[in-house]
Every structure is written in C-alpha cells, then in structure tokens.
Amino acid sequence: MTAKVLKRKLALRIKRKRRIRGKISGVATTPRVSIFKSNRTIYVQAIDDVTATTIAAADGRKLGIKANKEGAAILAKEFASVLKAKKIDTAVFDRNGYLYHGVIAAFADALRENGIKL
C-alpha cells in the first residue's frame, strides 16, 4: 500500500476510535477494556475512566504470543484471570477503532468464554 492509503486508513481508525470513546465509559466496578493491536503483539488494559487509572493490564510480549487469533485467546485467558483476581466480572469492551473481526473478535469471544461479561 502507498503512504497515502496507509495515512487514510489510520485517519479512519482514529475517527472510529473517537466516535466509540464518546459513547462508552468505564468505572471501577465495570472498567473499559481497551485493546491495542500491532503487527507483532497485542496489548490490553482495564481502565477506570472516572479516576483515569489502569486497573489491570496484559501484554502479549511478556507471554511470547503473536498478534493472531490463537494469541488473542491465550491473552484473553490470562487477562480474565487477572480481572477475576481483582473481583471484576463485568466490563465494557473498547475495540479502539478496530473492526470487530479477526483478532479483536477472537479476543472478545475468549474473554466471554473465560467468564467476563462484555
């Protein structure tokens, strides 16, 4: 892809991200689960927007996983155990402007399978 096309795709993702963030918010009991996907790995964190603090976080680099569906499922299982340890069973999913497809959908489905309500 050319640089112009990549710039446009990023601009559209940021536009979607801002639109989504205007509609959702997380609190301490139901935090916002924000996901970031790079070409190599996945990062996820649970955020309390009222106090602007990160409640829990998981990093694909520490687990040695790749940014694919299988890696997303492994990361979701690990992240669900961290949330359960902090007695959180409900969250609001922030797909961060990414389309709900592939890795993002696999992560959300695996998080639900591990007992976190989204």
Curated annotation (Swiss-Prot):
Which Gene3D superfamilies does this UniProt record tie to the protein? 3.30.420.100
Question: Has UniProt tagged this entry with the keyword Ribonucleoprotein?
Answer: yes
Please list the GO terms describing molecular function. 5S rRNA binding; structural constituent of ribosome
Q: One of this protein's Pfam families, by short name? A: Ribosomal_L18p
What CDD domains does its record include? Ribosomal_L18_L5e
Which InterPro entries did the record assign? Ribosomal_uL18_bac-type, Ribosomal_uL18_bac/euk
Q: Which UniProt keywords apply?
A: Ribonucleoprotein, Ribosomal protein, RNA-binding, rRNA-binding
* An annotated GO BP: translation
Recorded GO cellular component terms are: cytosolic large ribosomal subunit
**Which family is annotated?**
Belongs to the universal ribosomal protein uL18 family.
Q: Quaternary form?
A: Part of the 50S ribosomal subunit; part of the 5S rRNA/L5/L18/L25 subcomplex. Contacts the 5S and 23S rRNAs.
Function field: This is one of the proteins that bind and probably mediate the attachment of the 5S RNA into the large ribosomal subunit, where it forms part of the central protuberance.
NCBIfam families registered for this protein in UniProt: L18_bact (TIGR00060)
Which HAMAP family does the entry mention? Ribosomal_uL18_B
User: By what name is this protein known?
Assistant: Large ribosomal subunit protein uL18
Q: Which organism is it from?
A: Campylobacter curvus (strain 525.92)
Name the gene for this chain: rplR
